Amino acid sequence: PSDTVNSGAVFYLKASADPTQKWEAIALPHEPTVHRMQWVQIDAKRWDLVVQPLHGRANKNNAGVGAKMLAYEKPADPKLPWKITVVNEVGHVTHNLHATRWSASPAQEILSGSKEGIWLNSFKAGAWINTALTNVPTGELRDGKLANGQRFLATVEPFHGTTSAVYTQDAEGKWVRQQLLDGFKEGHAVACADFLGTGSDQYVVGWRGADPGIRLLTPLDAAGKTWRTSTLTTKEVAVEDFKAADLDGDGKPDLVVAGRQTKNLVILWNAR
């Protein structure tokens, strides 16, 4: 992360005719400090590879040009040049991104966090539009829905942060912050899902530093004004990342947790 000039790499892996044999690694252009990537739906038939670096090129002390989040459009032959479009280049210390869908369009929007706050990045008429939603430095972020149908944003703040907050919109559409947790170290994951089957999403937040853990935050009213905190794990897993998914087909989201420092992979099965 400290080398903002020459670090990082992006490869597309092409399967051989026999996928059990060695795959071909195709190098793609990249920004330094590349950190997160995922496929994002751009229209009904197209998915782009979106890559987020930590810092802008040649940044020092988290200052300088903005970090370039790039969208790579795959050609029919992946060995040919990929069309690359800048998604967002105004944020600094940009740790994570989240593809979501806020409209009826097939296209997904991208939520991204930065030192400047949370951005909503939308692809419209062939170009990316960046809308600032908040102004608090943000590292991790996901979105969920409350029982009243209102959307909320769940965060770790700031980069590798020590606090977690939720944002809901007021009558004027402004995102209002409510801090729910603080005092942890190196927050590194957030996920939203209806783990409890209440008709409203809850969110989980995890961290890896000092006394690691995962907490479940549950809204106690339809508008998300009051939340309850429950402990899911403690020092047994230092959370690097996690993903909510229904692994056993019972209709209930489970949680897959990866611990880098604790060198383990843990599945929290939903037993409700």
Predicted segments with their positions:
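Beta-propeller-forming repeat regions
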Residues: 1-272
